[in-house]
UniProtKB/Swiss-Prot annotation:
Organism, as annotated: Citrobacter koseri (strain ATCC BAA-895 / CDC 4225-83 / SGSC4696)
Gene: cdd
GO cellular component terms, A-Z: cytosol
Name of protein: Cytidine deaminase
Role of this protein: This enzyme scavenges exogenous and endogenous cytidine and 2'-deoxycytidine for UMP synthesis.
Stated family: Belongs to the cytidine and deoxycytidylate deaminase family.
Length: 294
């Protein structure tokens, strides 16, 4: 078990601990639960779906990287496939506050990059901020997404974001978590191809500036992130943050990164290179390259 889970795990009910122990045994537990695992945990713990999600929130919050605020937020995105995806907020010392990943973004980005096609609900241990409410409004689940908070009855995003502005106001038809393939040819080595593949699935209907990032760890594991734009612009999630999020959720740390590749167009209206390189260098990675999309 990864050390970050030990405190939260020890506070769970005994029957839930027994059911979770085999799942968490891998130090690189991927911070997600398959539909089958969720069913097993419900059966062994006697908890219904909502109660189980609340019980597991401390494990999601344990994934947070909060070197600045020391305020851990955890989220669990529940996919329409039945798979659950953990998320935790991330802060990056030496970078800028704008590079921060919120817990809801972490869980949602996690689900999207794992290939989930839509979300039914999200469970969070603190009220979503306005930034996250706007981020969630980019999803194909729209304002019907259910939000579960401790001590409150569930509400939809519509309740938390009245008079909402979103992609439909800009006549955007393809939404975040809809399947997308921008058709860039895969070329180069495995890491370069992974970055291009990440760019192929990015969501960029406002700037038409595709980008993707691939990070290679010292053990050869590769994590990718795809660019995810938002109708309100500022809640946009850069591709590096998506990749760092997956790396962290899988139990890796920044010193594990040995190489990074950014894929983007040289003539795109928005360029990720400077921000990507600056953040990676702040985290100790200097082996950074860029491949230009055709």
């Amino acid at each position: 078990m990864h050390p970050r889970f030990q405190t939260a795990f020890g506070q769970l009910a005994d029957n839930l601990q027994s059911a979770l122990a085999p799942i968490l045994a891998d130090e690189h537990f991927p911070a997600m639960l398959t539909a089958e695992q969720v069913s097993t945990l419900k059966r062994e713990s006697g908890l219904d779906e909502d109660a189980l999600a609340f019980a597991l929130l401390p494990l999601a919050a344990a994934c947070a990287r909060t070197d600045l605020s020391h305020f851990n937020v955890g989220a669990i995105a529940r996919g329409i496939s039945g798979t659950w995806y953990f998320g935790g907020n991330m802060e990056f010392l030496g970078a800028t506050m704008q590079q921060t990943v919120h817990a809801e973004q972490s869980a949602i980005g996690h689900a999207w990059l794992r290939g989930e096609k839509g979300l039914a609900a999200i469970t969070v241990n603190y009220t979503p901020c306005g930034h996250c409410r706007q981020f969630m409004n980019e999803l194909n689940s729209g304002l019907d997404l259910r939000i579960h908070l401790p001590g409150r009855v569930p509400h939809t995003l519509r309740d938390y974001l009245p008079d909402a502005f979103g992609p439909k106001d800009l006549e955007i038809k393809t939404l975040l978590m809809d399947e997308q393939d921008h058709g860039f040819a895969l070329e180069g080595d495995a890491l370069t191809q992974a970055a291009i593949a990440a760019a192929n699935k990015c969501h960029m209907p406002y700037s038409y500036s595709p980008s993707g990032v691939a990070l290679e760890c010292k053990d050869g594991r590769i994590f990718t992130g795809s660019y995810a734009e938002n109708a309100a612009f500022n809640p946009t999630l850069p591709p590096l943050q998506g990749a760092l999020n997956l790396l962290n959720l899988n139990g890796y740390d920044y010193p594990d990164i040995q190489r990074a590749i950014l894929a983007e167009k040289a003539d795109a209206p928005l360029i990720q290179w400077d921000a990507t390189a600056a953040t990676l260098k702040a985290l100790g990675c200097n082996n950074i390259d860029r491949v230009l999309l055709g």
